[in-house]
Every structure is written in structure tokens, then in C-alpha cells.
Amino acid sequence: MKRKIYKLLICATIATSLWAVRTTKVYAWDGKADGTGTHAMIATQGVTILENDLSSNEPEVIRNNLEILKQNMHDLQLGSTYPDYDKNAYDLYQDHFWDPDTDNNFTKDSKWYLSYSIPDTAESQIRKFSALARYEWKRGNYKQATFYLGEAMHYFGDADTPYHAANVTAVDSPGHVKFETFAEDRKDQYKINTTGSKTNDAFYSNILTNEDFNSWSKEFARSFAKTAKDLYYSHANMSCSWDEWDYAAKVALANSQKGTSGYIYRFLHDVSDGKDSSANKNVNELVAYITTGGEKYAGTDDYMYFGIKTKDGQTQEWTMDNPGNDFMTGSQDTYTFKLKDKNLKIDDIQNMWIRKSKYTEFGDDYKPANIKVIANGNVVLNKDINEWISGNSTYNIK
């Protein structure tokens, strides 16, 4: 929002120092806007690996869904590179980082970063886009679902990049860009076509043991990110030799491809078995994914809130206020809300709403297009709004 210009001024020095690097390659594995590059290679090989590893006893529905995914391969590739070009993204790619030991991105762990911390991490983005992908797939929107899955795999690839898992930015070390360019130039040498296991062997079968997607996803990503972080200190920093960089890139990219095949395998099973992992489980947090309308003046500078009321009459409301500008025309903004009641289940929530409060005496109107609410790895509410909200107003979404 424009009212947050003072926040941007705090960021100005940091943004200026990174700008020259950003215009080259600040992000993790390379990716082009046309769906090519290292990220796209990882996503493509993830599908190839799974196809090669598929055991003969996999259910027909899994095979059919894999075929649908293959038919939408270009959307997977486009999604796998899109986060580096998303106009809604944070300027410094803060949410592309995740230290598996601290659970933070560099905005909380780096001493030089003095601005507002960003709550989103590469790990949380994996879970968000996976939830959106499963939701759209189950509705038959395979093209959009595959694009979202590609976005999720982009962030998995980021979490599996040595510099990103160690929270070492291009400000911290020139090796960040150099190493990832090194890997991009040699990516075809690092392709793998199998994990060495069939889907009825331990690597794949273990992927299905935890029905709680959020819990499984976090620990699955953590196992790969820990290896990537160790690689930074042992083989990928600026003190290491070219041979050591070659080893680091080979291991990290092989793991990225292997892990991607695992995520896709889990995705295919989740969309095929029809189970709802959010049902009858305690909800610790809600994630709101809000799209602002694309027409002129649809955005707002006013204060925005999200609230819930439970069946026993308890209410909780949160401010929706990301660092930088949000609720801008055409923007897609994500907010995570921690629930005070740790024993709450999604069915215990009776009402949800968004509320607008005027920033100035006059305020301005706001036109949200859509809001999706995610709980326990599933989209539990999808509301098309497309209405103007004026003044101090509350709009009930449930």
C-alpha cells in the first residue's frame, strides 16, 4: 500500500545494494520466463524419473493422472520458472530462501538485513502452491493445477540450493550468483533419469506414510535442504575449488530432481485417493491467498483485516499487512494467521470475513476478485467476490 512508503524507505539502501545483482541473477537455480533453464530441467526430469521408477503395481488412476500431467508438461515448466518473474514477488526474493535449521529466510537470520522480516519462506511456499495445485486438479483444472505444481517445485528447488539453504545472499557472497551460473552452464551433465528405486521401494513408499501433508512436506524438504546447506560449507563456497563446485552442483541438482519426483508422486496419490487431510485435524494456522481485481483503482491504501468466529462465539482478527505494497491492482497477496486456540478444527469455524477500515477520512474503495483460505494443506474456502467494498466495511466470505 502507498501508506507504507516509509517501509520502502527503510529498505532503500538494501534494495540499492542488491539492484545491480538482481538485474543479472539473484535467484537460485536459473530459469527463463519461457519455461527453460535449470528449474525447468529439474521439473521435467522429476516427471521422467517418476515415469521410469513407476512400479507395475501402481493403481491405474495414478498412471492416468501421470499421463494428464505429462500432457501439461509445458505448464509445469512455465510454473517452475515463474516465481523469478512474478510481478507480485518480493524484490529481494526473500521467500526463496529457507534455512532448515532455523526455519527462517535471511530476513530474520542475516545481520545486515535491517528492514521488516518476511514471514514466507521457500518451504512455506512449497506447501501453499501444492495446496492450490491439488485443489485445482480435483476440480478438473489440470492446466492451472500443473502450473501451480510447477511453482511449488520451483521453491523446492530453491530450498535445495546450497546458498539458499544456508541463507547466503548475493550481498553476503559473490559466490551466490557464480555458483548458480556454474550449475546452469553444466545442468545437462547433472541430469538423472531414476532414483535407483521403484515406487514400491522405501524411498517412494515412505513418502506416503504420513497423511498430514504439511508435516510430511516440511520434513521431506528439510532432509534435502540440510544436505544442500552442508554442501555450501563443504563444497560450494568461494573458498572451494572448481572440482568441489562440480561435486556440489552434481549432488544438489541430483537431489533436486529426486526430491521433485517424490513430490510429484505424493501429489498424484493425494489427488487420486480423494482424502481430505484437513478434516478432523487441529488447525494451527490459516493461509489467505487474496487476488485484487485487475481494473483501474481496484486496489486500496486502507487498512485490511481478516477475521473468524467459531461456533462457540469466539472471535479472532488479524491485520493483513505485508512489507512493501499489497492490495494493489491485480496483485496476489498471501497472509498467514496463527490461531490462538490450538484445539480448533476447520469445522469449528462458523464465519470468516475480510474488513476494510479507512486510512484517511475519505478512504478509498477496494475490489477483491477472489480469496482462497488454506488449512492443513487444503483449500477449505474459495470465494469469488468481484464487488466494491467502500468505507469502513465488513465482507463475509463464509
UniProtKB/Swiss-Prot annotation:
Q: What class of enzyme is it?
A: hydrolase
Specify the PLAT domain's residue ranges.
284-398
Under the GO molecular function aspect, what terms does this record hold? phosphatidylcholine phospholipase C activity; toxin activity; zinc ion binding
Q: Where does Ca(2+) 2 bind?
A: 321-322, 324, 326
Q: Which cofactors?
A: Ca(2+); Zn(2+)
List ligand-binding residues for Zn(2+) 2: 164, 176, 180
Q: What ranges does the record give for the region Linker, renumbered to this chain?
A: 275-283
- Where does it mainly reside? secreted
Which residues participate in Zn(2+) 3 binding?
84, 96, 154, 158
List of residues binding Ca(2+) 1: 299, 365
Instruction: List where the protein spans the membrane.
Output: none
Tell me yes or no: is Secreted among this UniProt entry's keywords: yes
Residues engaged in binding Zn(2+) 1: 29, 39, 158
Regarding domains, what does the record say?
The protein is composed of 2 domains; the N-terminal domain contains the phospholipase C active site (PLC), in a cleft which is also occupied by the 3 zinc ions. The C-terminal domain is a putative phospholipid-recognition domain, which shows structural homology with phospholipid-binding C2-like domains from a range of eukaryotic proteins. The ability to bind membrane phospholipids in a Ca(2+) dependent manner and toxicity is conferred by this C-terminal domain, which also contributes to the sphingomyelinase activity.
Q: What's the protein called, per UniProt?
A: Phospholipase C
